[in-house]
Amino acid sequence: ILHLNPLQEAVQPEGDVNWRGLVDKIADVCARLGKPVIVKEVGWGISAQTARRLIEAGVSAIDVAGAGGTSWSQVEMHRAPTERLRRLAGAFADWGIPTAESLVTAGYVRAELNRPDVHLFASGGIRTGQDVAKCAALGADLVGLASPFLKAAMESAEAVVEEMELLTAEARIAMFCSGAEDIEALRRPGVLVEEK
């Protein structure tokens, strides 16, 4: 998994902002590794242009990790050693492309390039089983979330299991109320997402 964190790098004192030739390097890793390569954003979403470049570079999957989850610019704001860096990082607290928008955009690019073999993952601001169902309806092959589990883990291992069961029940209810018997049915136009 290769993670992309340009904003975080730009607002931290030790950040590396020399990203020249990055797509070529990713393409080289994809060609030489012999294993699936996943590229993950870290909370600001993947644009159409970035999705296109990554798919053309040969990645196997993209985690769009859109805005709405952990804001690494805010993390950097809290650890910044100077007021200037705190202000700089804080200025980008709301930066990014929301997960749903990024997921739909990456899906259009994947379809345009005729690359159904490239998997799309959704993370960033996912909190409920209903969110999971919506991401699946928008084309996510995998949905990731942390916040509900981290909060439950502060309580107990049993609370984590309960959270997992609750999220599963919420997703199933969303599917039931949508008339979708499985994930593929949930993805049909008109079920959760309007036909275009």
Positions of predicted regions on the chain:
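Residues that line or immediately flank small-molecule/substrate-binding pockets and catalytic motifs
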Residues: 2-4, 66, 147, 190
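Generic anion/oxyanion-binding catalytic loop in active/binding sites
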Residues: 11, 124, 175
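Glycine-rich phosphate/ribose-binding loops and adjacent secondary-structure elements
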Residues: 19-157
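C-terminal extensions of enzymes
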Residues: 149-196
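Active-site beta->alpha loop and helix N-cap motifs at the rims of alpha/beta catalytic domains
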Residues: 1-13
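Short, well-ordered helical secondary-structure segments
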Residues: 9, 49, 84, 88, ...
